[in-house]
Amino acid sequence: MYNYLLIRYGEIGLKGKNRSYFEKSLVKNMQSALKDLEIGKIKSTQGRMYIPLSGSSDELTRVLDRVTRVFGIETVSPAVKVESDLEVIKKTALQVFKNHMDSISPQNQVSFKVDCRRADKLFSKNSMEMNQILGAHILDHVPGLKVDVKQPQILLQVEIREDGTYIFTEKIPGHGGLPIGTTGKGVLMLSGGIDSPVAGWLAMKRGIQVVGLHFHSYPFTSQRALKKVEDISQVLSRYGTGPTGGFKLITNHFTDIQKAIQNYCSESMWVTVMRRFMFYIANRMAQKEQAMTVVTGENVGQVASQTLESMHAVSQDVVNLPILRPLAGLDKKEIMSKAETIGTYDISIRPYEDCCTLFLPKNPKTRPSLEQTKREISKLNFEELVEESLEKTEIKYFEPYQDITEEELTFDV
């Protein structure tokens, strides 16, 4: 039934002189998300974007699932576009209204409201007149209705524009934010836990093109632990659709570094020294990727390694880029809820431990000093261990919609 998808954006509309750059980026990202579907050209006009549809419900389901994951979009509406003729508008508005009625299967009397906006000033009727005409037409043809202008169960919206009239009843929320790629590139320190995927998602929401960096310690950590991270990367790829598409995961083989730390460093400092190595490698990877930031899933005070003293000790002097910690102000419950929304939670709780979990000492140092950390690292051949680790790096790309099943689609239209 629906032949267009209306796209509304929020923050992009406030960008002033740079607005066109953000709008073009949003269009490119939507095109990237829909590249394997036979979709017509996306149009942009008068603060709206329009995606043409064939009218197939299967197509609408797929397009909605993908478009609502693209950052920068505030809401979307499946709409029927018709010529701006009064009788055609009346007939179509009634069809759209009945279609929505059928989808909600009301048990009691239904309240409704018509909200018409006339952007085309050459149209013969004004907005108020159209509200009255369409409201009366619906009341005449659908029994058991009542008008409620404050809290209607069904809001029929009509936009009369220069290129035609758009009729719809739904505003489906997107995730807002900024189009990916508009604010730069970052390297995400990605574990298999709950936190780091959410941190990466939040960085993406602010327009950052994220590259994942995972530290793998085979055989201490299993291939199933790595598969867990790859599955998380697959989920993130569906949100990370920027102009280049997909999600890039860099896997750094960290085993030899962890062995050296375990053999030569004080047990209470294992985590601190290990994380300092990780930050140094992340900084090197960021430089190689021409990224401008390192993103982590650290929170403040959530675990022993996340005190302010510890954060200072693990990153000071080894990272010369901004470090983003999007979760710093969130409670664990909030992070878990967001992980469920994103779709990474069920993957993250699989019982396969990552390299940080396996090497936890009995009594970790919670407030290590930078000097103490440097003394521990001086026991190791830091540069040699790092270079050997970098030589064992692997890269894998994840396409956002490869092998997607019907059950994974979000919308049932």
Curated annotation (Swiss-Prot):
Cell compartment(s), UniProt: Cytoplasm
Pathway stated in the Swiss-Prot or TrEMBL entry: Cofactor biosynthesis; thiamine diphosphate biosynthesis
Keyword presence, tRNA-binding: yes
Sites where the protein binds ATP: 189-190, 214-215, 275, 297, 306
Cellular-component GO terms for this entry: cytosol
Catalytic activity: [ThiI sulfur-carrier protein]-S-sulfanyl-L-cysteine + a uridine in tRNA + 2 reduced [2Fe-2S]-[ferredoxin] + ATP + H(+) = [ThiI sulfur-carrier protein]-L-cysteine + a 4-thiouridine in tRNA + 2 oxidized [2Fe-2S]-[ferredoxin] + AMP + diphosphate; [ThiS sulfur-carrier protein]-C-terminal Gly-Gly-AMP + S-sulfanyl-L-cysteinyl-[cysteine desulfurase] + AH2 = [ThiS sulfur-carrier protein]-C-terminal-Gly-aminoethanethioate + L-cysteinyl-[cysteine desulfurase] + A + AMP + 2 H(+)
Classification via InterPro entries: Rossmann-like_a/b/a_fold, ThiI_AANH, ThiI_fer, ThiI_N, THUMP_dom, THUMP_ThiI, tRNA_STrfase, tRNA_sulfurtransferase_ThiI
EC number, as in UniProt: 2.8.1.4
Domain THUMP: 61-171
GO molecular function, one term: tRNA-uracil-4 sulfurtransferase activity
Keywords, comma-separated and alphabetical: ATP-binding, Cytoplasm, Nucleotide-binding, RNA-binding, Thiamine biosynthesis, Transferase, tRNA-binding
Domain of life: Bacteria
Gene Ontology biological-process entries: thiamine biosynthetic process; thiamine diphosphate biosynthetic process; thiazole biosynthetic process; tRNA 4-thiouridine biosynthesis
Similarity annotation: Belongs to the ThiI family.
Function: Catalyzes the ATP-dependent transfer of a sulfur to tRNA to produce 4-thiouridine in position 8 of tRNAs, which functions as a near-UV photosensor. Also catalyzes the transfer of sulfur to the sulfur carrier protein ThiS, forming ThiS-thiocarboxylate. This is a step in the synthesis of thiazole, in the thiamine biosynthesis pathway. The sulfur is donated as persulfide by IscS.
Protein's recorded name: Probable tRNA sulfurtransferase
Native species: Natranaerobius thermophilus (strain ATCC BAA-1301 / DSM 18059 / JW/NM-WN-LF)
